[in-house]
């Protein structure tokens, strides 16, 4: 009845509707969508955008789900002027297990033997979750040679003075 599309290959309504044509009731995409027709939701942050009529939704990404709840709390309580996320992330299926050609030369290196500085789609995805922070969020990714895991470091400049006690 339900499909969790997590291959990373199908990111548009057109591609995902094939599941619905095969009799599936709902599709949940595990990466940010490539078209605006698909709502992107992080539970506990913006699930109120759903009205129940959606057949296809995106659950953003693991990194977006990691950063969004923290960013939401800080933004609601202090306002965010600038945000920069650095994600340390296990290698992904976009990387090769051995050296070979790739459109991004850094990702051409063997994933299981290389620390790879790269981009992160989470910064862009966060601006979809928090449209008011559109020109505020930046970020980078570092892929590391482990098969699973993710860590996000956020540096924030907030609108009002705060203390460690207030944040905690």
Predicted regions and their residues:
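N-terminal Rossmann-like NAD(P) cofactor-binding subdomain of oxidoreductases
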Residues: 1-108
């Amino acid at each position: 009845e339900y499909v969790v599309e997590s291959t990373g290959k199908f990111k548009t309504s057109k591609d995902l509707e094939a599941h619905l044509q095969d009799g599936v009731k709902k599709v949940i995409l595990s990466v940010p969508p490539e078209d605006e027709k698909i709502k992107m939701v992080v539970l506990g942050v913006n699930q109120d955008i759903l009205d129940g009529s959606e057949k296809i939704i995106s659950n953003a990404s693991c990194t977006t789900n990691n950063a969004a709840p923290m960013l939401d709390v800080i933004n609601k309580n202090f306002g965010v002027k600038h945000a920069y996320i650095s994600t340390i992330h296990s290698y992904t299926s976009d990387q090769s297990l051995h050296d070979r050609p790739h459109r991004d030369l850094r990702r051409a290196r063997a994933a299981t033997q290389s620390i790879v500085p790269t981009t992160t789609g989470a910064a862009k995805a966060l601006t979809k979750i928090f449209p008011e922070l559109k020109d505020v969020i930046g970020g980078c990714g570092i892929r590391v040679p482990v098969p699973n895991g993710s860590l996000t470091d956020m540096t924030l400049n907030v609108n009002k003075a705060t203390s460690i006690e207030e944040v905690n």
